[in-house]
Amino acid sequence: MSQMKFAFTTVVAAGLLSLSPAVAHADDAPLNIHGFGILNLQNDYITPRGLFVTGKGETVQVIDGLVFGLNHDPAATIDDISFTVGTFNDIYTDQHAKTAGSWNEFDWFAGPSFHFARDWNLDVQIGQFLSPPGNFNAETNLEFALSFDDSKLGLPFLLKPYVKLFYAISGDSTVVTGAKGGTFDVEIGAAPTFDLSPYHIPLKISAPTWITVGPADFWGGTDNVGVFSTGLTVTYPLPITPRLGHWNAKAGFQYYNFLNPKLRFAQTLLGTASPGSGGHQDEVNGFLGLSFGF
């Protein structure tokens, strides 16, 4: 699943904090529901855990969901609680499956978010990765993402640090060669972001960067490190009336270094590298995107 799902749902959930206590607790207050959508055109499909899924043609990825505000109390330690449900779809232009055509993957995810101690956020999501053409058996997983809001530190840019625990419950290995359930990896990362709007330039530049580590059986070998990734994303807020939501266009690239030899071996099994070649050590994935939230 795309890394951007976590980032976007965190941003939408954070927006719920702007509600006043009167609005949040009034008996006649309207339902506090927000939504989001992301459309990306990419030259590759590479998962956050470093699985190089597709490399020929292009891939279109669509993420959408709803965020339900459940409770908002600025005086409480846990000052905001919300619940997110959503889906992820991958459309691979070079796939021509008899039963699914170019529909390569369908995922669903759901879970609560807790904002606490003023600057911390914990997202908990259960989900499944499904293969419409039957390339793999359903993969059920549980993910915990802890992030810190460093906007109050007074730095000229935001670091946006986070750590994620991805636990594979059952089904096929999410990296092909690893254990089928009962294992995990940890993603340690940050998304340094520089906002140029104070300089009258309507752009944000971010550099999403992470590394994955975990027990060797997650990849099926003897190494405890998975993938290192870094890149640049330029985001432009589209001048669309707020009544239609908040829209952004973006472009950028993400570099991946497949540190674990099992990730490189998996490429030869999936066809993104030639059999016996040893796989690609690294890859750059370019993308264009459109997102909205309300």
Sequence positions of predicted segments:
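Cleavable N-terminal export/targeting peptides
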Residues: 1-34
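Short loop/turn motifs that connect adjacent beta-strands in outer-membrane beta-barrel proteins
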Residues: 25-34, 69-84, 96-100, 115-121, ...
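Outer-membrane beta-barrel initiation region
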Residues: 27-76
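Residues that define the transmembrane beta-barrel architecture of outer-membrane proteins
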Residues: 33, 56-62, 81, 102-106, ...
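Membrane-embedded beta-strand positions of outer-membrane beta-barrel proteins
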Residues: 37-39, 64, 83-87, 110, ...
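Transmembrane beta-strands of outer-membrane beta-barrel pores
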Residues: 41-47, 68, 87-93, 114, ...
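Outer-membrane beta-barrel translocator domains and adjoining extracellular loop/strand segments
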Residues: 47-54, 95-104, 134-141, 171-180, ...
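Predominantly the C-terminal beta-signal and adjacent terminal strand-loop region
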Residues: 207, 216, 232-294
